[in-house]
Amino acid sequence: MDTYFNTGGRYNPGTDSWTATSINNAPEGRSSHTAVWAGSEMIVWGGSATIFSLFNTGGKYNPNTDSWTATSITNAPAARFAHTAVWTGSEMIVWGGNDGNSGVNTGGRYNPITDGWIATTTVNAPDGRDGHKAVWTGSEMIVWGGIDFNGFFSNTGGRYNLGTDSWTATSNSNVPDPRTAHTAVWTGSEMIVWAGFNGFIGGFLNTGGRYNPGMDSWTSTSMTNVPDSRSLHTAVWTGSQMIVWGGDGQPGALNTGGSYCAQGGPTPTPTPTASPTPTSTPTPTATATPTATPTPTARATPTPGSRPTPPPRP
């Protein structure tokens, strides 16, 4: 029988050390929940202990006091797992997920200061789904992909505007293939989605796309030196590159990864060589060394993976 945990730890990279988080007043053990960092607290919410035990509860963890405070359940979204959550700077937005029957397209905004919930509109919201991904752009939440309420892999999405409580569909032109268990990062101007799983088109994927919300357009990510196909991996944005690592692939769990540069630099232009200037006592002028600006190149060292195992579902 599976064990569901309500334990955790804080890792300090400066000292390479771990400190356990308190279990006093901690939420019940669970999986497939979400967590966001709110500037001074971690907020966890939702998840499941079994398909018959879903949660719409959560907690705020303060690392300075090593203490937990429960989140309100008044007006909280319905219990779910495999949803997404983003932090806006003042609120946590949770959306989508599975309610035990199918994917849903409902969500809520949680304010940790007032401990209050406000429902997100369902008008023009994307179809219900779980296993999707979401990013926060600074003004909008973008959700994309996942498994829809009919059980099909999705390549649709939507942009949720916090200020107007409204949805706008993302373009379906040049969009990546449908998938779940992928990753998504926000670069400051684009959302990059990569890899994932689609059982109808060969299983594990190593394709992706860059979505520009200002243009409502997609651009495919390069396949040159791309890491092996995978799902359930991780991805972060460094400020200039996306780094992906790990995941499930063929024939099993992977410990490989790669860095992807979304935009190349300018083409290097050598500085012209100075010509010697004759004088009464001929002395050649030193030749200037050509300088060039290197063009960043995304590179990865793929390593074959192991068994094709679809991403687990709680």
Locate the predicted segments by residue.
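Kelch-like beta-propeller repeat domains
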Residues: M1-P268
